[in-house]
Every structure is written in C-alpha cells, then in structure tokens.
Amino acid sequence: ADCIVILNEDVACTAPRIALAIRQAKDNSGKQKATSLGIPQWQSSAIQLLVKSHPVPVFVLADGTNQTQTLASHLIHASSQDAVRVLSVVADNLNETTANDNRTDDSFSRYEANVEQLCRALREAERPLILAGWQQNQINDLKVAANLCKAVNNPGAMLCLIPDGSNSLGL
C-alpha cells in the first residue's frame, strides 16, 4: 500500500498483525525510491535515510487516544460522526460531486486542510488501503469506508474491514 487510511479503529488492539503490516508498509515508498536510484539492498543506512524522508502517508481518523496513532503520519482528531463526514467529503471530492451536504456548518472548516491532504494522497496512490472496523459498532464507518474505496476509482485500491476483537474471525 502506498497510502493508508484508518477510520475509527485501534488496529493495534483488534488486528495486531495488520498493525505490523502497516508499520512495515510505511517503509515501502523509501525502499522503492532506493531501488529506482540503484542503491543496493545491503546499504541499509542509505535505504533507512530514504525511508525516513519518503514515508507512506498513514491517515488515522480517531476520536480518542489509541495505540494506532503511533503509526500515523497524519492524525485527524474527530468525533466518530465528524470522521465519517470527513471521509464522505473526500469521497465526494474524488468523485467531483458538486453537491456537498457534509459541509453545511462552520464547524467543518477545521477539517478542510485534512480533506485536501487526503484527497491529494489518494489521487497519487497506486495501491491505497482503507481500513475500518466494527470496534465502535458504527455501521456508518463501514459504509463510508466502502464508499471511499469506490470513489478512489483505482483497480489497486484495497478495503479491509476488521472484526471487533483480536482473533474473532474464525473460518
């Protein structure tokens, strides 16, 4: 993944292996840059410098403090309802929808810069990953994540819906 969006989910608690994968994916952009520059893999110090200067953007939309915030390069503190509104506006912008009912009040203006950053990152991404879950028992989280994945209109876009507890998905 080259852009990751996490909506109202503490992935570190509900899906620790996914949290590990996100932590490792943050280095992908720097490693790809090193490969394109012809830096051999055994030069780990040079690669680590590129990893630090070219991180994969990780947007975390959360209403409280959680362990997943340590993964974030962009942390958006918002109530659960506001986080859904932010992603709805992002989806509308990506679809270039002119009617935007989610911006009707002045309280939304504090999220405008975040919306622009997120739209830019999702447009530039080749393989964006959108994560949402059932941790907060909000069906709107799942709906807006699915709508955002559709709005990205990218065949490489990925959607991950996480159950409410660690190891709770049994097959």
Positions of the model-derived regions?
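Cofactor-pocket helix-loop regions in the catalytic cores of large enzyme subunits
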Residues: 1-171
